Amino acid sequence: MDPNTVSSFQDILMRMSKMQLGSSSEDLNGMITQFESLKLYRDSLEEAVMRLGDLHSFQNRNGKWREQLGQKFEEIRWLIEEVRHRLKITENSFEQITFMQALQLLLEVEQEIRTFSFQLI
């Protein structure tokens, strides 16, 4: 993974974990968990692409990888909508900046996953 993307993930996760969003802290924890899961999935796709000769192994290890890919895109779309919603309702500038950066990162990661998945097909 690009070092800038890694630091962006780490920075956003750290800042989101410090936010206090009142009764929606459970939702925020869910978002953080999904961000972490998305990062791991993106890393595994990149690793499979980098070892393209190992594609057969990747497909055997994860026989339903196309189905999983579809689920990840659904998660990304949900996270994008959730981040946009949070961005609209928050008045705290720290939270606004964090959510804007999270939105940008999600869009970048979605594009990277699309690129990797096309290379694997």
From Swiss-Prot:
<comment type="subunit">
    <text>Interacts with protein M1. May interact with host nucleoporin RAB/HRB and exportin XPO1/CRM1.</text>
</comment>
<dbReference type="Pfam" id="PF00601">
    <property type="entry name" value="Flu_NS2"/>
</dbReference>
<feature type="short sequence motif" description="Nuclear export signal">
    <location>
        <begin position="85"/>
        <end position="94"/>
    </location>
</feature>
<keyword id="KW-0945">Host-virus interaction</keyword>
<keyword id="KW-0813">Transport</keyword>
<protein>
    <recommendedName>
        <fullName>Nuclear export protein</fullName>
    </recommendedName>
</protein>
<dbReference type="InterPro" id="IPR000968">
    <property type="entry name" value="Flu_NS2"/>
</dbReference>
<dbReference type="GO" id="GO:0042025">
    <property type="term" value="C:host cell nucleus"/>
</dbReference>
<feature type="short sequence motif" description="Nuclear export signal">
    <location>
        <begin position="12"/>
        <end position="21"/>
    </location>
</feature>
<keyword id="KW-0946">Virion</keyword>
<comment type="similarity">
    <text>Belongs to the influenza viruses NEP family.</text>
</comment>
<dbReference type="GO" id="GO:0044423">
    <property type="term" value="C:virion component"/>
</dbReference>
<dbReference type="GO" id="GO:0039675">
    <property type="term" value="P:exit of virus from host cell nucleus through nuclear pore"/>
</dbReference>
<comment type="function">
    <text>Mediates the nuclear export of encapsidated genomic RNAs (ribonucleoproteins, RNPs). Acts as an adapter between viral RNPs complexes and the nuclear export machinery of the cell. Possesses no intrinsic RNA-binding activity, but includes a C-terminal M1-binding domain. This domain is believed to allow recognition of RNPs bound to the protein M1.</text>
</comment>
<keyword id="KW-1048">Host nucleus</keyword>
